[in-house]
A protein has these predicted regions:
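Active-site/ligand-binding loops adjacent to catalytic centers
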Residues: 3, 49-143, 182-203
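A short, acidic, amphipathic alpha-helical segment used as a generic capping/interface helix at domain edges
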Residues: 125-128, 133, 149-160
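Glycine-rich ThDP/TPP pyrophosphate-binding loop and its adjacent helix/strand module
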Residues: 10-55, 61
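Active-site catalytic pocket residues across diverse enzymes, especially alpha/beta-hydrolases
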Residues: 23, 47-51, 155-160, 187
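A glycine-rich, Thr/Ser-enriched phosphate-binding loop motif common to dinucleotide/cofactor-binding enzymes
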Residues: 1-18, 142-147
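Short glycine/serine/threonine-rich phosphate/pyrophosphate-binding segments
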Residues: 33-44, 68-69, 144-152
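Short beta-strand segments
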Residues: 1-2, 33-35, 60-62, 169-173
Length: 203
């Protein structure tokens, strides 16, 4: 599924049009993580190429240890954990599962030109977002969804978009029920004093 281009083509033919229709054609930013690269690649290509949303910002949500942040921001597929003397068996040392790599998949490579920005999300912030979404919105989401949500906050902050009315779409791609033994185990251990009271405290 990493190299099979039917992956991104399905999202080009189905997910992209679904988002475009449900948002009444009004989308300013789309945010997703990269696992195979199929979701972000297919949706980005559909919105930018087929619907000609040239002003749309497409952003990658990247966990710590993954190389896509530097690939998008600086053109180099690299993370500091790869430097000489720091290589380890489990390269992507993060609680976040399902997204983040240190290689370019075909699904990502053929659609890279449609991606604009990337945000590096630390485990701590993803865990805080998980608790925030559960406590305030009743959403029990997994780790990949939570780094996507964190990237929304980063994007809004970087471009000073608070109260702008911009339409930002992110993918809630996994349920917390599939992350009970690792991610949510840590999320539930966050002390009450460390929980955030507003999204402004998150990033």
């Amino acid at each position: 599924q990493f190299e099979n281009e039917l992956n991104w083509k399905v999202h080009f033919e189905a997910t992209g049009p679904e988002i475009y229709t449900q948002m009444n054609c009004q989308i300013d930013c789309f945010i997703s993580g990269i696992g195979t690269g199929g979701t972000i690649g297919g949706v980005a290509r559909y919105l930018k190429k087929s619907q000609k949303l040239y002003d749309l910002d497409v952003c990658v949500a990247d966990p710590q240890g993954s190389g896509f942040f530097n690939r998008i921001r600086h053109g180099v597929m690299y993370d500091h954990l790869e430097k000489e003397g720091s290589r380890r068996r489990h390269q992507v040392d993060t609680l976040v599962e399902g997204v983040g790599l240190n290689r370019i998949t075909k699904n990502f490579g053929v659609n890279e030109k449609y991606i604009d920005y990337a945000y590096r999300i630390k485990d701590k912030n993803a865990l805080q977002m998980a608790r925030w979404l559960s406590n305030h919105d009743g959403l029990f989401l997994g780790s990949s969804s939570c780094i996507n949500a964190c990237s929304v906050v980063d994007y809004v902050r970087e471009f000073k978009l608070q109260g702008s009315g911009k339409n930002i779409v992110f993918i809630a791609c996994d349920s917390g029920s599939r992350h009970l033994s690792k991610f949510w185990k840590e999320a539930l251990n966050i002390e009450e004093a460390a929980l955030i009271n507003s999204l402004d405290e998150l990033i």
